[in-house]
A protein has these predicted regions:
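Acidic/His-rich structured neighborhood in mature extracellular/periplasmic domains
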Residues: 1-69, 86, 92, 110, ...
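Intrinsically disordered, low-complexity boundary segments flanking structured domains
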Residues: 5-7, 77-81, 131-135
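Short alpha-helix capping/helix-loop boundary micro-motifs
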Residues: 70-81, 95
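Generic hydrophobic, helix-prone segments enriched in Leu/Val/Ile
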Residues: 72, 85, 136-138
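Short linear motifs in intrinsically disordered
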Residues: 81-83, 107-108
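Short gly/pro-enriched beta-turn/loop segments at secondary-structure junctions
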Residues: 85-86, 101
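C-terminal soluble interaction/assembly domains
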Residues: 91-147
Length: 148
């Protein structure tokens, strides 16, 4: 996880990959964005990561970064797409906010035909790592990005 979240696995704020899509970008990318390979319904959105609607940065010490974000809308996530997911794939829950790529991140765990979303819940009643079926978790969410 340190290798994924931090450039050269150096745990420091200035080495942190602050946005999910940072993991698959640049000279130090550690995963590949496979989202578009999973569905013909993939949507591509131009975003200005770290930019608030008023133009200010969300995180003052992090630069605003233009990026094309790909995601599969939830309504197109079906059995065929779920069958392509593998244990260890990273799932980002797409954010419609202009300065963000995702709202939450987790890892795929396959249990036979079940696709489990392992994530750290921030809900007050949970505050722990949880396993939930991905399809159920996605109800009411915009869509997903998938990295491998």
């Amino acid at each position: 996880l340190e290798k994924v979240r931090y450039v050269d696995a150096k745990v420091a704020f200035n080495q942190r990959r602050h946005f999910f899509s940072d993991w698959a970008e640049g000279d130090h990318k550690v995963v590949s964005d496979i989202t578009a390979q999973l569905s013909p319904h993939t949507v591509f959105v131009n975003k200005q990561l770290n930019k608030k609607s008023n133009g200010d940065p969300i995180i003052a010490t992090v630069k605003i970064t233009p990026r094309v974000i790909s995601y599969v809308p939830t309504r197109f996530i079906d059995r065929a797409l779920l069958k392509q997911l593998k244990t260890g794939d990273y799932i980002g829950i797409y954010s419609s906010a202009s300065g963000l790529d995702v709202t939450h991140v987790g890892v795929v765990i396959r249990e036979g035909e079940k696709v489990i979303f392992r994530h750290a819940s921030s809900q007050r009643k949970n505050l722990r790592v949880m396993d939930v079926e991905l399809f159920s978790y996605l109800q009411g969410k915009s869509g997903i990005m998938v990295f491998r």
